[in-house]
Amino acid sequence: MNPDFKKDYYPNLFTWKEFEYLLNIRPLMTDKRVFILNEDSYMWSNSALSLNKNCYPPSLLEDLLERYTCYFVDMSRVTKNINDFARTVENKYKKQCDAHVYVCRNPDVDHPFGIHYDLVPNIIIQCEGQTNFKVWDKLENITDKMGHGKINIGVTGEPLLDVIMNPGDMVLVPEHYPHHAISITPRLSVSFPIQIYENDDREDRHWFRFEG
């Protein structure tokens, strides 16, 4: 597997409007799914009717999304398009994948990961806005086996890829390849991390519809 970039790979995978709809379903916005990339902690009051007290209130979440880079995990079934694409990835590579939604509404804030590498391959699709995406040559002798790789690392040399991603564009970043995403405008993207080992553990990709 090598780094790759394709224009207009999947137009209309996911939109601001679809994301807005999900954000307003408070039970989905748990602290296990929502990651605000800063070092602060937050407290809030809950309605007596709330079943899960660890869900971000929409007013707080809106404020944080306007100021910080955030990402959301376990999102591979949130729309039919994302679910279908995750199924395609799993069938192609014979491995399980998730979908992580990344959002940056404030292009002036530095990406907290900086230049970093991951321990699994990622297919990243730009959904809204523009991103300058760079990928450098593979790092050898990586000893990490678990976790999320390393962030804010130093690399030398010219990047293998240095592209402006527009809605529908795709970049494939294999494991151990340093990369950096710089938001040019407010942007929304979906990353599909692919597990390293082949296995039969799959999300149920059935999509039901009510008839009539």
Identify the meaning behind each predicted range.
Residues 1-3:
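N-terminal low-complexity, Ser/Thr- and acidic-residue-enriched intrinsically disordered segments
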Residues 12, 20, 24-167, 177-211:
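Active-site region of the double-stranded beta-helix
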Residues 16:
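Short amphipathic alpha-helical segment that frequently serves as the phosphate-/nucleotide-binding helix
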Residues 172-176:
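Residue-level recognition of conserved beta-strand edge/terminus positions
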